[in-house]
């Protein structure tokens, strides 16, 4: 939905505002790595379906470690780009940035670029945009809520930090 509120155009993307605040707060401690997971966009679900969370990462080595851990531990994920050129779509005439763009292109990547603005510049960051729901049961995976990407992240963290 679109609604005008105090001269700001707000799109149905309010959850990313809360996540942006959380990422800003997490960055204050200057951690080595931040990983967040959210049911951020329907665009990720459309792009990779219900079985794979979309993965965005600033650093290739972090993305590769998460992809490897996911593959080894039966929790595959799929990397999508943080394509900087799409950041143009977050420009605003009245604010520092928009939280959602007005076209239908690259919705998951643009949402991830929005979040990227709120993570400290020198911090390694990875973001899972996950559907978190299994529409049909599979062996060892019942129908319903599912923490897609969680095992991949946990195993990568254990490998990296012990």
Task: Tell me the role of every PLM-derived stretch.
Residues 1-162:
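A generic structural signal for tightly packed, nonpolar segments enriched in small/aliphatic residues
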């Amino acid at each position: 939905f679109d609604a005008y509120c105090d001269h700001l155009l707000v799109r149905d993307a309010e959850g990313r505002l809360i996540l942006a605040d959380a990422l800003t707060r997490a960055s204050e401690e200057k951690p080595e790595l931040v990983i967040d997971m959210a049911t951020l966009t329907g665009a990720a679900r459309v792009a990779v379906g219900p079985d794979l969370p979309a993965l965005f990462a600033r650093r290739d080595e972090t993305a590769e470690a998460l992809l490897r851990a996911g593959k080894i531990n039966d929790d595959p994920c799929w990397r999508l780009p943080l394509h900087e050129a799409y950041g143009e779509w977050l420009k605003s005439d009245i604010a520092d940035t928009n939280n959602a763009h007005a076209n239908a292109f690259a919705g998951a990547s643009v949402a991830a670029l929005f979040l990227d603005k709120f993570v400290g510049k020198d911090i390694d960051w990875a973001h899972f945009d996950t559907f978190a729901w299994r529409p049909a049961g599979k062996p060892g995976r019942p129908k319903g809520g599912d923490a897609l990407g969680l095992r991949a992240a946990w195993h990568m963290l254990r490998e990296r930090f012990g």
